[in-house]
């Protein structure tokens, strides 16, 4: 019976330590959010379909927390933004 109590206590302590480590990792990964609305307004300023462009840009910005600079191209500045694709394999982000 004593062995069972020691085993149970060590298991609970291990779980508690893992919970603290996980909580520390979650709070340390918070990056500051950018203003997607203004970045996408700039990105879509020359688009022939500004509403569609702004919606797609906003989705990409929310996922990647960055928007490629300028009105087109420059996907190398934000690799996540440039790598998102639609189901058809086309670029999702304007």
UniProtKB/Swiss-Prot annotation:
**Modification comment:** Six disulfide bonds may be present.
- Name under which the protein is recorded: Gibberellin-regulated protein 11
Print the keywords alphabetically: Disulfide bond, Gibberellin signaling pathway, Secreted, Signal
Q: GO biological process: any one?
A: gibberellic acid mediated signaling pathway
Q: Which organism is it from?
A: Arabidopsis thaliana (Mouse-ear cress)
Q: Which GO terms describe its cellular component?
A: extracellular region
Tell me which PANTHER family the record gives: EXTENSIN, PROLINE-RICH PROTEIN, GIBBERELLIN-REGULATED PROTEIN 1-RELATED
What this protein is reported to do is described as: Gibberellin-regulated protein that may function in hormonal controlled steps of development such as seed germination, flowering and seed maturation.
Q: Which residues form the signal peptide?
A: 1-23
Q: What's a Pfam family this protein contains?
A: GASA
Subcellular compartments: Secreted
Main location as per UniProt: secreted
Gene symbol here is: GASA11
